């Protein structure tokens, strides 16, 4: 296989992995915990996964503490927990 064909194959496999939704049984347990703003007073834009609505939602993170259901972007949240 040529290097161009191999590169195309790797790109397609990566795209497929990014677009494949996370099923609820494969979803990490931390995706099911409620958002925790943390104990500090910063106003950081963050995202958490809401299992009832089955989507990522923006919230204000305090900047420290909190839990694992806390993502810097909606895309990062979707990759980890699905949508």
Swiss-Prot record:
InterPro entries: Kunitz_BPTI (IPR002223), Kunitz_BPTI_sf (IPR036880), Prtase_inh_Kunz-CS (IPR020901), TFPI/VKTCI-like (IPR050098). It comes from the Eukaryota. GO terms for molecular function: serine-type endopeptidase inhibitor activity. The keyword Endoplasmic reticulum does not apply. Keywords: Disulfide bond, Protease inhibitor, Secreted, Serine protease inhibitor, Signal. PROSITE patterns: BPTI_KUNITZ_1, BPTI_KUNITZ_2. It is found in: Secreted. Its main location: secreted. Residues 31-81 form the BPTI/Kunitz inhibitor domain. The record marks 41-42 as: Reactive bond for chymotrypsin. Disulfide bonds join 31-81, 40-64, 56-77. One of its GO terms (cellular component) is extracellular space. Belongs to the venom Kunitz-type family. Serine protease inhibitor. This is Kunitz-type serine protease inhibitor B. It comes from Bungarus candidus (Malayan krait).
